[in-house]
Every structure is written in structure tokens, then in C-alpha cells.
Amino acid sequence: MKRSRFTEEQIIGILREQEAGVATAEVCRRHGVSSATFYKWKAKFGGLDVSEARRLKALEDENARLKRMLADAMLDNVALKDLLGKKW
């Protein structure tokens, strides 16, 4: 997954600019982001403050780590079942 060049704090700041009355197109042009990216950020971070955004990011990272651990454990389980299933 491509890493964002904006931190959560920067994204929330950009969203707040638009909420303060600056046109969406102007905010996007000023920061060099597409309107699609802006609205994706608004759907994800709209209404969050910086600490909530950090918590969301931490939870997403933990979720991804746990999914990788589960996949590894499932592969190990399949390998062990195959090994034990063979007759000696």
C-alpha cells in the first residue's frame, strides 16, 4: 500500500480549511491533491480530531499486523496437517 505524503495532522488541517469556508477546489489546488483524494479523506477523517486520527491509524496498523499473524498461523497449521496426514 502506498504511503501517504501527508500526516494525519496535515490531512485534518486541510479538511479544516475547507470547513472554514475555503472552496474545495482551492484547498485541493493549494495542497496538490485531487478532489477524489480530498473526499476520501473527508469520509475517513471528517469529524475526527488529531488524537482520534492517531488512534484510528494505530488500530488499523494493529489490525493489519494481526491479520498477517493469523495468515502465518493458518499456513503453519496446514503444513502440520499435511505432515501428520502422511503415513510413515
Curated annotation (Swiss-Prot):
Q: What is this protein called?
A: Insertion element ISR1 uncharacterized 10 kDa protein A3
- Which SUPFAM superfamilies does the record associate with it? Homeodomain-like
Q: Does the keyword DNA damage apply?
A: no
Naturally occurring in which organism (per UniProt): Rhizobium sp
What is the similarity comment for this entry? Answer: Belongs to the transposase 8 family.
Q: Which GO terms describe its molecular function?
A: DNA binding; transposase activity
Report which superkingdom the organism of origin falls in: Bacteria
Question: From its record, what is one biological process in GO terms?
Answer: DNA transposition
Q: Does the keyword Iron-sulfur apply?
A: no
What are the disulfide bonds? none
Q: Which InterPro entries match?
A: Homeodomain-like_sf, Transposase_8, Transposase_8_domain
User: Which Pfam family, any one of them, does this sequence belong to?
Assistant: HTH_Tnp_1
Keywords, A to Z, come to:
Transposable element
